[in-house]
Amino acid sequence: MPDWDVYLVTEERLSADRTTVDIVEGAIAGGVDVVQLREKGRSARERYHLGRKLRALTREADVALIVNDRVDIARAVDADGVHLGDDDLPVPVAREQLGPDALVGRSVSFVDDARDAERAGADYLGVGAVYETGSKDDIDDDEHGIGPDRVGSIADAVDIPVVGIGGITADNAGPVVEAGADGVAVITAVTGADDPEAATRGLGAVVSRARED
């Protein structure tokens, strides 16, 4: 099981004209713990080829690689696991496809859903959107996000790692971890930064300080 402090979700269209490979290289240099291949606008073939490149980078750096939604691509690139949403395969089916050692994550916004995901065999939860974000089409039940307090309620309700996601930056990551999250997942806080390496390192420092408080 990896550390979860800083979890990067890739999205090249939000990467300020840089490639996802460039962003991930910087994030790895900055100490990222997990990289999730998202890239919603790309074809399966494009994600597969990008996934192979990211697998080589992350394996060399001992960083976990997760594929968003697509169990087939996760298996094809030998990723460490897959992250699933409401419209994706059920957790037990993904587990059957990827094997007992794979990491299977699940997106949730409510305590009951978190408990259900844990019972189904999820290894970790992505909880959000914590704050308002422009990377998704909606913000669950609240246009401003669910807030750190609900992240804490979910963390208290389960025994698996919880990662806050949605609108998180170095300026607001602290309260998410203080509420009980094991780490924070970000897109534009790193992909849109002038220096992805420094941005990743800064987020890691914020998470570490918040955990000590």
Predicted regions, residues:
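Glycine-rich phosphate-binding active-site loops on the catalytic face of alpha/beta enzymes
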Residues: D86-E96, G126-I139, G167-V206
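Conserved N-terminal beta1-alpha1 strand-loop-helix module at the mouth
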Residues: M1-D80, Q97-F110, R115-A122, S153, ...
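Short, amphipathic alpha-helical segments
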Residues: V108-V111, H144-P148
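Structural motif
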Residues: E11-E12, G85-D87
